From Swiss-Prot:
The record marks 97 as: Important for activity. This is Glutamyl-tRNA reductase. NCBIfam families: hemA, PRK00045.4-2. Catalyzes the NADPH-dependent reduction of glutamyl-tRNA(Glu) to glutamate 1-semialdehyde (GSA). During catalysis, the active site Cys acts as a nucleophile attacking the alpha-carbonyl group of tRNA-bound glutamate with the formation of a thioester intermediate between enzyme and glutamate, and the concomitant release of tRNA(Glu). The thioester intermediate is finally reduced by direct hydride transfer from NADPH, to form the product GSA. It catalyses: (S)-4-amino-5-oxopentanoate + tRNA(Glu) + NADP(+) = L-glutamyl-tRNA(Glu) + NADPH + H(+). Transmembrane segments: none annotated. The gene is hemA. The active site is at 52 (nucleophile).
Amino acid sequence: MVDNIIDTDNYYAIVYTYKTIGLSKLYEHYIPEKDLINIRFSDTQVSLLQTCNRVELYLYTKDRNKINDILSKLNETHGKDISSNAIVLRGKDAINHLYQVASGLDSLAIGEYEILGQIKEALTSCKKHSLCNEEIELLFNAAIKVGRKVRSLTNISKGKVGIYSIAIQKSLEVMGDLTDIKIAIVGAGEIGSKLAFMLKNNGARNLTIFNRNLDRALELSNKFGYNAELLDFQKVNEYDLVFIAINNSNPSQLRLDKPKLVIDLSVPPVVYKTSNVIYLDDLRVISDNIILNKREDIKKAEAIINEEIQKFESLLNNYNMNRLVSRFMSEIEWVREKEVDRAFNEILKNYADKDNIKEIIDKMTYSLIKKVFSPILEDLRKDPNNKKQIVEYLIEVFQNGQFSDTKTQKIEKQ
C-alpha cells in the first residue's frame, strides 16, 4: 500500500468557540504560538485558527491517538484541564466545520468577511513554522474558495454583517454624526486598525489611538492622520466615544463613566458593565437578529457547502491518483534506465560510438514506454475512485522500486 495517500478521515478539528464555552472564558483557551510548536508531533500536521470568537486547531494525522496526546499537551501548557470542553471533529465533520467558518455561518456576525483573511493567515503561519504540509494547505485553500463562492452566490454578506461593522453602526445610532465627536480607540492591533479605517470612512476626525506601545500607536495614527498616546485610562475616560480592543489577561475591570458610549470588544471585557457600555456579547444579540433575516441565504450557503465537500473529496481522489501515477511512472523509469544500461553494455562489445548508441537506445525505450502506458494512464485518470487500487497493485508488483530477485531472474532468462 502506498503511504502518501490523503484520506479525509485523517482530518481533525479541536474546537473552542463563543458558542461552546462563551466569550468570557474563551481567552483562557488561547494558544501562544510558541506553545503550538511544542504540542505538535512529528507525524501530525497542525494549523491554529485563533480569533476573538474561536480557538481552533485543524490537524492531519493517521494516528487517532495523537489527538488525545495533543489534548493532554494543551492541558499541560495551560496548567489546567481545558480538553474536557473541547469539541473534536473528524473527517467530513471537520471539513464541514471549517467550510461553515469560512462562509461566515459560524461567526459571531453572520457572513463576516474578516474570517477569510484570518484563515489565510493561519495557513501562512503554519507553513512558516513548518507545522503543516500539502494536506492542510489543500483543505485551507479549498475553504477560502468555498467562503468566496458562498458570498458571491448568496446575500449572506450583504449589509452590516461584520462584528466591527455592527459596532460602528451602533455608535452612529447613539452618537449621530461622528465628525466632531472625541473618539478614542484603545488598542493598535488588527481590530484597532480596522476600527480606525472604518471610523475614517464614517467621517471621524477627532480621534486618538491609545496603546501600551506608543510606537505602534504612532504607526497606526500616522496612517490615518489621527493622534496617538500611551495608554492611560484616566485620559480615555475624558472622551465621548470609546472603542476598546486589547488582549486582557487581567480579570479585574475598571470603570469609564464619562463617555457617552463605550464599546468593549476585548475578551474578557476590560470595562465594568454599566448603561453606557456595550460588550461583544451584546453585539452578538444584534448578529442573531441579522441571522433571522438571512435564513434563506443560510440554506443556500449550506447547500453550497455540502456540494463543495463532495468536490473536495473528488479533488483528493484526483490528487491521489496523480500521486500514484507519478509513483508508478518513477518505478517504470527506474526499470527503463536499468535496461538502457544493460543494452548499452552489450552493444559496447561490438561498437565503438558510445554517445550515439546510448542516445538511440534512450530515445527508443522512452518512446516505447510512452506508447505502451499512455492509453492505460489516461483510462485510469478518467475513473480515479474505482481504479486507484489498480495503480496501487502495479506499484506493489514493483515492490517499491525493484522487482523481486525471483522476478528479475525470470525476466533475464527470457
